[in-house]
């Protein structure tokens, strides 16, 4: 039937002489939607018309057979397919009316900003259909067979911008930026303050466009059959009460005898569920995306086969001054990187010729360069920001990465949630396409599904060790929540800790706080109350964080007060209680925090302490076995003791905690949308610290948060 194009896209008609327009045909390629998605959505073509640049005959979609000497080359990913279209459509690209938010690559806790950046960045690109290819209902899963690796050319046009740092125009923020770059620490407080309520920046028009976009994405996914689930379920016969261990022994698989000997020395007798499910697939040479609960042996699951690849690789000539790095492990935080390297050294006990090196922020770049040059470095464990520094500044480092045979993204969801997507894409482009890639994570949100497009091969396997209908937390962990006004939180925290200590001789407690400076405040308070306390957060130097982390790992009778730098993957054995004070960022963060206890099948306890206006968060946990607990009685003497201890906490720490608290909750959409109410709650928090008047906040910061001239705030 004849079609009349709207005036705004009619100019394109002459270039479509070979284009076949199909009506209500789901098997054709919606090419114009990749180019004019916003325009066509505006004119309501999305649900009626599909476009194909194919001749008017039936052909398999996206099946490219390129003959070279009679052989069929390896199939390309959708990203590479669209790379070939880039020149053709370049003349028709127009800039989006929405800017792309950039996040600092080295910010380890810039989670909220990272998600918003990715959301806008994806909508801002012509290849948005590619990035959203796994769309649709998250519960429906996705087809892992259609994914592929991206070539270096896929990111050629983005290399110059992938690692460009944000420059703050205001002189008052430049000093903070320099300090953050020097320590590669996540300055969660300043970041959240500067970002403000970023969710409110989306207009109603943006939200309507998102709905149209999601509808188009789902139709495209359905048209190509990408919504059909292709998942390997790990031993579905096991119920939720089963141990995380299996009966399968490591020597059941063809592993190096020296590796098996090291495994035995480490006390590992049988495999965990995730190890049993992934090892045979990886040994076949396939890529893997694995979802498993925290504390179930994911680190060994990816390290052991990585070591096997290194063992089977031909030895490097001693004359080679730049020997290749064979296995590259990317971790989101320094603590996780150090932990993975320690585990690797344990497994390499009888492989003296194989070396593991760690490159993380907070240490001198020159020392790392020297260590990698003088010591064996077949396996490299790194955080994304520091790895980027070496790619840019270490001579010959990029050449060494050309030898990578195994790439591992540990805690993949956290890497992307922190805004490291650009770093990950750059790293993928720096290593060979012919490699094995493993993504291990406790959760698989949309961001992880998107990175699969560029990181994994089309024939990769999705191993799901968290079955549908089972809970995502360990059954042996007793979960409770308590609701109390802010003015009672400090007294309740002290009472809960004191009762737990009295009932557990070998107590080992982790207290999670919302921000680094609130963590500092709580640690100071508990120290004034004569509790045995240590603190870890992004404001502490790396040497201190490593020392405290090792001390807490080996000790008992200790309380660790921490921000979310300790929330993911860090293995602290025998933690008896995890106490979360205040609103977690989201459901996944609650699960990860809780996962610090109940590890390796041991029992544990988790308490979530919220204010009445934070109670809405519990609706996201309704499928978890968390129960409401009555508040313990607090005697007047305890209240006086806590108030006296608060008086001894330094005023500057209270001021910093107030500002950080305000910035954190300003970024929570349910709370930050009402600025007047937000300020009332912040001042309630100020009074809970024993302050009669709320601390003054710089006008620049208030402006960045969108809180200028809000009643109840003091500016300076």
UniProtKB/Swiss-Prot annotation:
Alphabetically ordered keywords of this record: ATP-binding, Helicase, Hydrolase, Nucleotide-binding, RNA-binding
Compositionally skewed regions (Basic and acidic residues) per UniProt: 110-121, 155-188
Disordered: region residues: 99-188
GO molecular function, one term: ATP hydrolysis activity
Biased composition (Polar residues): 144-153
Boundaries of every Helicase C-terminal domain copy: 497-643
Entries under Gene3D superfamilies matching the protein: P-loop containing nucleotide triphosphate hydrolases
SUPFAM superfamilies attached to this UniProt entry: P-loop containing nucleoside triphosphate hydrolases (SSF52540)
Pfam families named among the record's database cross-references: DEAD, Helicase_C
Motif (DEAD box): 410-413
Span(s) of short sequence motif Q motif: 248-276
InterPro entries associated with the record: DEAD/DEAH_box_helicase_dom, Helicase_ATP-bd, Helicase_C-like, P-loop_NTPase, RNA_helicase_DEAD_Q_motif
Family: Belongs to the DEAD box helicase family.
Domain comment, as recorded: The Q motif is unique to and characteristic of the DEAD box family of RNA helicases and controls ATP binding and hydrolysis.
PANTHER family: RNA HELICASE
Name of the protein described by the UniProt record: DEAD-box ATP-dependent RNA helicase 31
Species name: Arabidopsis thaliana (Mouse-ear cress)
